[in-house]
Amino acid sequence: MKEETGNLVIDQKIVDLYRQIDTIINSKEEIKKSRYEGKLNISAKTQKVLEDIDDNHNYSLAMGIIRKNRKNLNRNALSYRGTKISYEKLFEMVYTYANSLKNTGFKKGMQVPVFGENTPEFIALYLATNLIGCELLSLGEWFDKDYTEFLLNKSGSKYVFVSDSVYDVIKDKLDDSKIETVVLMNLGSSLPKDKSGKNYNPYAEIDDRFNHDFSDKSERIKTESKKEVLKIEEFLDDSMSDDIVCNMSLDDPAMISFTSGTTSPGVPKAVLHANRSYLTLSRFKDKDISGLASMDGKSVLCHIPVYTHMELATISDALYQGCELCLEPFYDRKFFKYSIVMYKPNYSPGSEGSYLDLCKNLNDNPEFKNVTLKDFVAMCITGEGLTPGSEKYINYTARKHKFGTHAAPRPISPITASIGGGTSENSGVFTTLFKSLREKFSFRNEPFGLIALPFAEVAVLDDEGHYCK
């Protein structure tokens, strides 16, 4: 059902979604309060932003993203192997997923376990879980068997959502857990459709080189699993409800991500995030706060595993800023170059090894001889800081292949995000951002181009927010 609003014809689900959100926002108008005055050693501007978040953004991350894009409904939100999904269509999906979760028995505070990939189905599930007040438990297929079973059993959930591309790896873990129903998400469900209505992959020639499998595995899995197995299409309920959006606060738990697991192989540390964590990260990237160029309408490659905070934050930040997510379900250093060329994103996080492989192929592989990346404005290197030699080589390649020159007069040097003692995540408190200042340094006596910037003040606070030992 469609409803005409101004010059737009909007799906009834979207109208109902914003009606429920507006009702919750109006109910919060009388309970604004500041918590920060005189308690933290922070700048006046930072304090003002934190007060604004408390006063005007005291809700779930999903509500924040949906509110922020109220005027962007016709804009592309997701790109997936040639399929384009608008913000309106994405929010319709979120509505359907949220309603289906609630009708299945999920309530505020419950955990929704997921073994996902970067697909439209995962994005919809991510936002829907948060919208109804549940906690996303985003798991990796490589986690230790006993650890996986512990997390699944502790979640209390009867359901687990699984990308069928990883099912075979976790089958025994699921079979031996207390989970009752496995809901499968197929990598091929959101591929473009041909004239006969069948899904097809316009990049099949490239994917086939890497044995990437988009086929529907549900019938085989249904015969092999000890659990009830549903396809995501069988799980979804397309009805409507007056009670989908949960009235959450900033400090309500929202999602659980995991570190790389290098300390104890197979047993990565879990990190519980409140709505405040992701909304604060996103709000501080707004142009009026950061002073940086707006991300509005830019495209971001999402290819890092979705159990990491870095990827969940990349997704939430980009959607909050009205960006287009370029979804890549395969995290592979050797495939990264093809993801960049296929999607031509404006921004992408990636490991040093991924970027060096991209640069080597751009410079030496005849297949990439004529490739220019004029839309590729920002490179973010995850993990430890770049060596001077690596940075020099990446900068050389960026100049040669004209990275980002549609938006900037010359290529921008890579930005590096790392943790002391960690790899590829920014979920810890010991986070340092490295920002290229484009200043001239002596190549002989000191590193060049990267200057450390403090990202967070580390302090011990009591329950009232005062400093203590």
Walk through the language-model features, giving the residues of each.
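Conserved AMP-binding/adenylation subdomain of ANL enzymes
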Residues: 279-299, 307-349, 360-362, 455-457
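Gly/Ser/Thr-rich phosphate-binding loop
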Residues: 230, 346-350, 362-443, 454-457, ...
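Conserved AMP-binding A3 loop
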Residues: 86-88, 245-247, 254-280
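N-lobe entry segment of adenylate-forming
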Residues: 1-85, 89-104, 108, 132, ...
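ATP-dependent adenylate-forming carboxylate-activation enzymes
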Residues: 116-117, 134-150, 164-166, 303-304, ...
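Adenylate-forming
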Residues: 68, 90, 94-97, 101, ...
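Conserved AMP-binding/adenylate-forming
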Residues: 83-84, 98-146, 301-305
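Short hydrophobic alpha-helices that are characteristic scaffold elements of the AMP-binding
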Residues: 127-132, 154, 308, 316-320
